[in-house]
Amino acid sequence: MATTVKSRFPLLLFLGIIFLASVCVTYANYDEGSETRVPGQRERGRQEGEKEEKRHGEWRPSYEKEEHEEEKQKYRYQREKKEQKEVQPGRERWEREEDEEQVEEEWRGSQRREDPEERARLRHREERTKRDRRHQREGEEEERSSESQEHRNPFLFKSNKFLTLFENENGHIRRLQRFDKRSDLFENLQNYRLVEYRAKPHTIFLPQHIDADLILVVLNGKAILTVLSPNDRNSYNLERGDTIKIPAGTTSYLVNQDDEEDLRVVDFVIPVNRPGKFEAFGLSENKNQYLRGFSKNILEASLNTKYETIEKVLLEEQEKKPQQLRDRKRTQQGEERDAIIKVSREQIEELRKLAKSSSKKSLPSEFEPFNLRSHKPEYSNKFGKLFEITPEKKYPQLQDLDILVSCVEINKGALMLPHYNSRAIVVLLVNEGKGNLELLGLKNEQQEREDRKERNNEVQRYEARLSPGDVVIIPAGHPVAISASSNLNLLGFGINAKNNQRNFLSGSDDNVISQIENPVKELTFPGSSQEVNRLIKNQKQSHFASAEPEQKEEESQRKRSPLSSVLDSFY
């Protein structure tokens, strides 16, 4: 028996070794993926686990929670990144990188949104974006509204119809589009243009001449205008309302002498070479300077000087004027790079010494300026005033041009009563304020003459909401009425002004309807002559009146009783 056991011992030993090996393999598979730990570490891990279980449910600081959550997010992000690589092994490397960047950006975005300061910045950015979009939408709606007004009313030119010819930090020059390009109605206006100038304090429009007659009117500010002739020079102190004619080809320059207020000037331009087109010829140091156009021989012979000296003194661009160089860089449109530049206070004082004020005499000379407001107004009451200069003998400047100049002031809530001009075509510029205009014409008035037989002669009302810078054309014979929603200041240029007559359709004075004889009134109107006369006499004011009828005013005053005032406070 002992011999048998001894002979089988190696076999039993071998089987025991195999059993132990299988046990070890099974244990190893069970612990796969975990870190290798020594017995001491395993014991410490067990103890820490027990401690963690004891702490479970206890209060933890917020920063520990945030750090724990952040670690979990990072772990999830890395795990998703790894799984994405494993699931899509066949994708291009750049595609995987894009996906990784997107996931990472989303994770960073979530982190930023959790930051209170970042959330505030995001809210501010979103509010600013909404505000910008709202302003843009309002601007587009206003532009569409103005375009719609112009489409419905060919007599209205909104302020955005001015084209900027020149602009820099010192001011700008703008020209209104041609009248005859808008409609055949304005065919007789093809040789008239409107130009607006604006200059900052202590600036100068440098010397130039234009191939057009100009009627210059100061809208705002104070200026010094110098007008040159072959053997003379005249300088004038100009203020608001001053008007002067500058004949075609006259060299002149204009200075804003005020310390604070911008200078605003408007020119009514009558070209002499080509209908509706004019050019400015300047003497300042730019490529539009007309002296540059002459040949060297002509310049040397004319000035009896070598060309090098002429070029240095008259033609070379100077390097001593950094302000002008900055203006050139800031110029946005046009080629007149130095049209408006800064001028020193000392230079202004020197120019001011020789300047005369506008004429206050009743009979101004042919070349002196006159002020629209220095004479008695044509019409005046508590609702408004109209000042007007007509081409009569006492105003010889306007005689050869057959143009009148007028200034209309309508107080807030007032109305210039319906009227029409017998001969004059009026170009009306809104200088200040807002209001409404109603102009009467005929339907399809813009059609060609050959279509007149088929044209409907029904009366058409054209309406316009007036804002500063807007221009309205009022043809002769077309009735018009203007109301003011704020104090309204208008400047008018009337063409074909000689023997023009303004006929009012309502009011106690200058009312053409009141002059109709009674028998004709009965034939003309549905009511009797007595009813017509009584109706006409209801308006006690002349030329200007309240925009609200007296009956409505009385009703509104009755409604504003103490009881109604108390009740209104609850609504």
From Swiss-Prot:
Residues 33-153, 320-339, 539-571 are annotated as: Disordered. One of its GO terms (cellular component) is vacuole. The keyword Signal applies. Residues 40-96, 105-138 have a biased composition (Basic and acidic residues). Residues 562-571 have a biased composition (Polar residues). Pfam families: Cupin_1. The keyword Signal applies. GO terms for molecular function: nutrient reservoir activity. Its main location: other. Residues 154-311, 370-533 form the Cupin type-1 domain. Residues 1-28 form the signal peptide. It is found in: Vacuole, Aleurone grain; Vacuole. Keywords: Seed storage protein, Signal, Storage protein, Vacuole. InterPro entries: Cupin_1, RmlC-like_jellyroll, RmlC_Cupin_sf, Seed_Storage-Functional. Seed storage protein. Belongs to the 7S seed storage protein family. This is Convicilin. It comes from Pisum sativum (Garden pea).
